[in-house]
Design a protein with these regions (language model features):
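Accessory alpha/beta interaction modules
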Residues: 1-154, 164-166, 245, 255
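Short, charged alpha-helical interaction segments and adjacent helix-coil junctions
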Residues: 2-12, 16, 20, 71-73, ...
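C-terminal segments that line or cap access tunnels to active or ligand-binding sites in enzymes
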Residues: 153-155, 160, 175
Length: 258
């Protein structure tokens, strides 16, 4: 099988839970609006803009690439993340992403009352809290009184593992099941069908995969050259077995071109 044929076969297996398809679908703010209306239980919610693969920079520490950053009609800034593997401390990841997004969107000298409201929506294939629920809201609670207090940061966790008959669960079926489409979610279903079943959509996904593969190969070569030139041999060795660390160094040292 040729390399192009292999890429086409891999492209057919993609679903919205996969980073590549999600980020492509998130180019359409109507898609983000539809899923956020369901997840945040707000049928009137509006998305003013969506930015897939938003680069959250941290000059003095770890930078991140957010799957999709959205600006909502009420002023909130939202990071939507999709995750298939339960392979790290994702609660800390949510906390960190929220902090990076907040600092990137806050100008110097801004008063604390004007720090933007930020919401991180974490969509996963697995039930992160093992509570047998498809949707979790994590609130800040005063331990002594049980009162919920708000500091402008929201954490919302959604998973595709629990099938509880809720609207969120139905949406997650479309996210993970190859043949699942639902008329309740016309934008999501239509976009998924276009990229999975039409020749034009499949061609677009293949082109994106080929481009990403080539760009990643070139960036890794650049990273290796930088590490060798700066004699960071321990870092170079670590990148051969720690893909998260390699990705971190790529973001910091070889940023993707806009």
């Amino acid at each position: 099988m040729s390399n192009k044929a292999k890429i086409r076969e891999e492209a057919k297996k993609l679903n919205p839970i996969d980073d590549l398809m999600f980020r492509t679908m998130a180019e359409d703010k109507d898609f983000c609006e539809e899923i956020l209306r369901v997840i945040l239980s707000d049928p009137k919610l509006s998305v003013l803009e969506s930015t897939p693969q938003y680069a959250g920079t941290n000059p003095q520490g770890r930078s991140v690439i957010l799957d999709a950053k959205c600006v909502l009609g009420d002023g909130r800034k939202t990071d939507i993340e999709v995750q298939k593997a339960n392979d790290t401390d994702h609660q800390r990841r949510v906390r960190y992403n929220g902090a990076i997004l907040t600092t990137n969107l806050t100008d110097p000298g801004v008063k604390f009352e004007n720090v933007p409201n930020v919401c991180v929506v974490f969509i996963s294939r697995f039930d992160i809290f093992n509570g047998n629920r498809s949707l979790y809201h994590v609130d800040r609670v005063i331990r002594e009184t049980g009162k919920v207090v708000d500091n402008g940061f929201e954490e919302v966790y959604v998973n595709a593992k629990v099938r509880d008959g809720s609207e969120v669960s139905e949406l997650m079926e479309v996210f993970v099941d190859d043949a699942a489409y639902n008329s309740k979610f016309p934008v999501t279903s239509g976009s998924k069908r276009r990229y999975k079943e039409t020749e034009k959509g499949q061609q677009r996904m293949c082109e994106i995969m080929e481009k990403i593969n080539e760009e990643t190969r070139l960036r890794i070569n650049q990273l290796n050259a930088i590490l060798i030139k700066s004699k960071r041999y321990d870092d170079l060795e670590r990148t051969t077995y720690d893909t998260d660390y390699q990705e971190q160094l790529l973001i910091e040292l070889v940023p993707e071109k806009a």
